[in-house]
Amino acid sequence: MNSTKVPPEWKRRVKSEYIKIRQQKRYKRADEIKEAWIRNWDEHNHNVQDLYCESKVWQAKPYDPPHVDCVKRAEVTSYNGIPSGPQKVPICVINAVTPIPTMYTWAPTQQNFMVEDETVLHNIPYMGDEVLDKDGKFIEELIKNYDGKVHGDKDPSFMDDAIFVELVHALMRSYSKELEEAAPGTATAIKTETLAKSKQGEDDGVVDVDADGESPMKLEKTDSKGDLTEVEKKETEEPLETEDADVKPDVEEVKDKLPFPAPIIFQAISANFPDKGTAQELKEKYIELTEHQDPERPQECTPNIDGIKAESVSRERTMHSFHTLFCRRCFKYDCFLHRLQGHAGPNLQKRRYPELKPFAEPCSNSCYMLIDGMKEKLAADSKTPPIDSCNEASSEDSNDSNSQFSNKDFNHENSKDNGLTVNSAAVAEINSIMAGMMNITSTQCVWTGADQALYRVLHKVYLKNYCAIAHNMLTKTCRQVYEFAQKEDAEFSFEDLRQDFTPPRKKKKKQRLWSLHCRKIQLKKDSSSNHVYNYTPCDHPGHPCDMNCSCIQTQNFCEKFCNCSSDCQNRFPGCRCKAQCNTKQCPCYLAVRECDPDLCQACGADQFKLTKITCKNVCVQRGLHKHLLMAPSDIAGWGIFLKEGAQKNEFISEYCGEIISQDEADRRGKVYDKYMCSFLFNLNNDFVVDATRKGNKIRFANHSINPNCYAKVMMVTGDHRIGIFAKRAIQPGEELFFDYRYGPTEQLKFVGIEREMEIV
């Protein structure tokens, strides 16, 4: 789209419309300020008059202490040079109070937060007149670090979201008027064709190939309606005004009145404002700001499946938001730690534990198994080999949590044929619900869009287990589900569903030389001690992890979040320790990692109750920190003290804060150095933890060249985290120190007092 040359006429048109919009904004803003000033002045005068009318005189009634006769008094004999009667008052002595150390506002948090880079300087920090006198160029250098971008400075090419939308609409009106003058009725025909194309794409489920060359996606029918004649009549010359730059334009007005802008409009804006992005990026931004439907853009998100506008869509569209926003590393939606592009996709590999097999007996009187000829069909299907045989997979070389399910205390009373456990009370309740639906015949059954979408989601999980699908839906009997499935199977091939799963692995024995593996871990740790990169799950299904794998390129182990095979040679296997995992005999401890509860089960890291955990290498992920007390320090400012004692190498606390990039840390660090107070802590080669704005109490631990604590960056379930540990035995009430790793110059500049060593 950007390769097309923009005519000079369009560039002049964009510049002219932009100047008009800026002038209108300026005049409107001036009128708003004037009106606001008048309103505030009237309200102020009204409040002042009320105070004058209801003013009260305060009468001082001093309290005289019992020893008032012995207190020294102050005497006044004249006022402004005019003699007056003597006035005496006792002198009250206010003793000096030691002020508490200065503290800047910060938000307490017990976890790290990933934040975006600040490319615009929001405010110019005040350093005091002394700093500006000594280094007058500091502010200039600071602004240069942000490429001269300061919040509030509106350069000639300034354009916020509201101006951008108004500029697009103004160009659309001028473009439409130009077509009207060239050929009467052309603009109306183009507008009608565009809107009709959009409606047809929604009604017929057909969408053209988009601008990026993506394959077309079939869209389902929608209930959207529109009258093209009324749209043509409502065309106006008035610009769309918004009251605030942060407020989006009227979405419904944009949808109903205006067609989608022509590509030349975004190309012309991009040519005049290249710093705002390419034409395609501006197009995406316009869609986001106005929620305008691009007729050439396939739909991604659908209405809520529980809402009244639920549509009958494919499984991919139904699960789009879940797959996009759900973080499989935090098990949260829209987590604060991992960015969307870093979210691992769903792992489509076959599970190793048993699947829920179809029921052998009918689940109710309305079960699909009671259909004539169904038992013979099911018997024939049972002779076909299953998709996956769970018993064929070797578990000796597996470190997944599922490989040791046999050691758990499961209830096997209701399980049959290695199936999953089914609670009898739950089955009875479900059967009662299904029995109440027996009177609903298949002819009376209505499959809403929500029912159809939910079936497509469950069908990929339970396959042909229609009883299980019906038990989950609770609105249809399994016979109704079976009949609907036959219609769906005509359009959806079951073989395509089988291909989504990993084929079964053949039974094989694989002897792991544990000592060689531990030696490999140590070599990898030693070679990459100075090059620690952030972990991002690799995603190359069907291909082994080689030099093209992102994990191998960054010298990281493949984790359980990677979409590579579970037999990957680069995947960390966990440990098999029977002890506390606090020595180098443990592979996890040796690799500076915490034990993973999904991988390390022999050491007790997978136990939910803390009383059953024998592993000492899970403190960071479980939050087993010490009780810390904050108080003024004898060294500098505030300090942090330990309420209870700690043994050597015992976990104290995690250093939490904002996770920022190295570039952002350089920009912030220049300001912190001037304040002579920094909370930056290197996490890896990509990110830094900054506890200035957000953090926990360990941020107040002071520096010492002879500390009683040490910091260690550990890999905790795929994330680098900073743990503070006791370097020696620490007594209760002792202040905590760790080495900031200052250079000789910074040591003398920032740390003027060194605590005295106490011999215990």
Curated annotation (Swiss-Prot):
Residues 626-741 form the SET domain. The keyword Thylakoid does not apply. Residues 215-237 have a biased composition (Basic and acidic residues). InterPro entries: CXC_dom (IPR026489), EZH1/2-like (IPR045318), EZH1/2_MCSS (IPR048358), EZH2_SET (IPR044439), PRC2_HTH_1 (IPR041343), Pre-SET_CXC (IPR041355), SANT/Myb (IPR001005), SET_dom (IPR001214). Residues 203-213 have a biased composition (Acidic residues). The keyword Endoplasmic reticulum does not apply. This is Histone-lysine N-methyltransferase E(z). It comes from Drosophila melanogaster. The lineage of its organism: Eukaryota, Metazoa, Ecdysozoa, Arthropoda, Hexapoda.
